């Protein structure tokens, strides 16, 4: 009896070559189930088991038989190679899920540089490239490998939220300068009412509120958004300078009524002697003449 173990993915072979000794050619083969066989074993198709070779004897010699036992080992299945596209700031992804063809679990992964990899691709750490999955074979079957080609798309960067408080008399400025981080300059702005906006804020004209900055992402990366909150304070109004000539016997009056413009109330007065002049009530018969300052 002779025997052999083959891999189910091996090429077809002749059973006759496995017989020991110096067998006569021209015999017949019988398969394990008793059916006829042409003497060619096709791994993955032919049934494993004992194949009998028979050479007919010439009377009074009996027939001669020999047996070849074939065992078949299934090859490892590493699946069918695939591809994966991830965002550079996305979550970790199991590379195994990018393989098709029912791959066997328990294989090993290698990075593009050939070093070992756990199989969980982290876009924040791992490099793009070809990752190889290998499933070890049981002799005589060799190991098999498949690959996942990973492409990493750079995530959009809208920076971090910012806030600013300005006076309504300040010069126009760019909201972009208020953002933190390292925002890309390719984004667009929206007003608090979600209308398109140029990004140039003009205090006293542009309304205060929360402005949105959006940088578009390339698939599979989503858009990135940041916000700038703008508070606008109204500048104080002390009115415009004025002069007033009064008679010494006139009634007391409030100096604010003599200022030009539309001054805010609640300010403070300073007399000609640079001393506080509480209330701003000017008594022509008592108060000294001169320049009174309203702040």
Residue ranges and their predicted role:
Residues 1-295:
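Proline- and Ser/Thr-rich low-complexity, intrinsically disordered segments
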């Amino acid at each position: 009896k002779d025997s052999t173990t083959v891999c189910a993915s091996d090429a077809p072979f002749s059973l006759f070559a496995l017989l020991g000794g110096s067998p006569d050619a021209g015999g017949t083969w019988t398969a394990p189930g008793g059916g006829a066989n042409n003497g060619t074993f096709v791994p993955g198709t032919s049934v494993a088991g004992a194949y009998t070779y028979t050479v007919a004897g010439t009377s009074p010699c009996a027939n001669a038989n020999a047996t070849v036992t074939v065992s078949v080992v299934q090859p490892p299945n590493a699946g069918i190679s695939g591809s994966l596209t991830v965002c550079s700031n996305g979550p970790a992804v199991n590379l195994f899920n990018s393989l098709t063809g029912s791959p066997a679990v328990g294989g090993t992964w290698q990075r593009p540089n050939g070093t070992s990899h756990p199989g969980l691709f982290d876009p924040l750490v791992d490099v793009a490239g070809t990752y190889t999955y290998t499933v070890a074979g049981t002799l005589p079957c060799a190991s098999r490998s498949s690959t996942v080609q990973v492409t990493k798309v750079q995530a959009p960067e809208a920076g971090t939220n910012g806030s600013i408080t300005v006076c309504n008399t300040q010069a126009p400025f760019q909201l972009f300068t208020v953002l933190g981080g390292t925002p890309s300059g390719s984004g667009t702005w929206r007003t608090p009412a979600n209308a398109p906006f140029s990004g140039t804020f003009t205090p006293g004209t542009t309304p205060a509120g929360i402005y949105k900055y959006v940088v578009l992402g390339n698939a599979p990366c989503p858009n990135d958004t940041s916000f700038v909150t703008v508070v606008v304070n109204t500048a104080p109004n002390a009115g415009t300078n004025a002069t007033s000539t009064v008679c010494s016997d006139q009634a007391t009056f409030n100096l604010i009524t003599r200022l030009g413009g539309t001054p805010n109330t609640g300010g403070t007065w300073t007399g000609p002697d640079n001393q506080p002049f509480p209330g701003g009530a000017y008594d022509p018969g008592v108060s000294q003449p001169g320049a009174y300052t309203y702040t």
